[in-house]
Amino acid sequence: MEGNREKRRGIFLTLAGGMCWGISGCFGQFLFQEKGATANWLVSIRLLTAGILLLIIGYIHQGKKLNEVFHKGADAKKLLGFSIFGMLFCQYTYFVTVQYSNAGTATVLQALAPTVILAFVCIRNLKLPRGFELAAVISAVLGVFLLSTHGNIHNMMLTKQALFFGLASAVGAASYNLLAADLLRGYGVYVVVGFGMFFGGLVLCAIVRPWEHMIPLDVETLLALFGVIVIGTAIAFSLYLKGVSIVGAFMGSLLGTIEPVTAIVVSALFLGSKFQWIDLLGFVLILGTVLLLSLRTPHEEV
């Protein structure tokens, strides 16, 4: 009974994080289309600012315990690896894919992350994937494809660069799901997500120099940045990764496909985006994946 309650809690947290990502995507779309923001500028600002925010909150709650992770060399290296090869790598390769193709193509390719995780888990455990695990992966990827392209494969722009960076973003998404779990159990959300974003943001800021490409910071921009940084980054990653620490990387990555569902609904309601009938099938496939995972438990992963 207690295990089922904890599983439901993990599913809820993971879904809530994915929904926050979907909401923040609409704020990001507004900044790109109306305020002239670039992907490099927004990602560097969101990671660094959200990281600082979480570390401040963490210090208020935990004080000097916030730095305990650096007292153990192995854990400090894991945290640095999560920051660079998980958090930063996933974010950066996703937006580079968008640059070489479009958002729909990038979303579909990154949605292959559960496949990467399932392959890793099965190889590590020397087990074949179970039928419902394969069904969940296929359902989620197909659902994301339908939502991102409206069922038209010609809406995907698969240049060599887009394919390379898109697959890299799937590996990055798998990495931050897998790398975060042990650290979260030992140190909590504020330490892992806070330092992960802070270090990742520092590295990216050094590369893209966002201060050289500032956009006008009017009221609309600040409100949209609040949505991206607070709702879509600090809160979203904290909820999502806490959920992943409970349900596991494979299930978490599949539940995270709720993001495009939320993004399309919010875009249709507030940004005037068109809603097509084929999107309903995508909704059904993704929500069916969520239902399937709530009833079954995948292989032990992390």
Ranges and model annotations:
Residues L53, Y94, A113-I138, V261-L281:
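C-terminal transmembrane-helix exit sites in multi-pass transporters
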Residues A39-I52, F95-A113, T159-V171, E220-I231:
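Structural signature of hydrophobic alpha-helical transmembrane segments
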Residues Y59-T105, L146, I229-V247:
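Specific transmembrane alpha-helical segments of multi-pass solute transporters/efflux pumps
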Residues G18, I45, M87, Q91, ...:
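Helix-helix packing/entry segments at the starts of transmembrane helices
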Residues L54, G58, P129-G151, L204, ...:
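Hydrophobic transmembrane alpha-helices of multi-pass small-molecule transport proteins
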Residues K35-L88, V116-F120, V171-L179, V193-E212, ...:
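Transmembrane alpha-helices of multi-pass small-molecule transport proteins
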Residues M1-I45, I84, N155-D182, L202:
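Glycine-/small-residue-enriched transmembrane alpha-helix faces in small-molecule transporters
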Residues L31, L42, R46, T97, ...:
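Hydrophobic/aromatic residues within transmembrane alpha-helices
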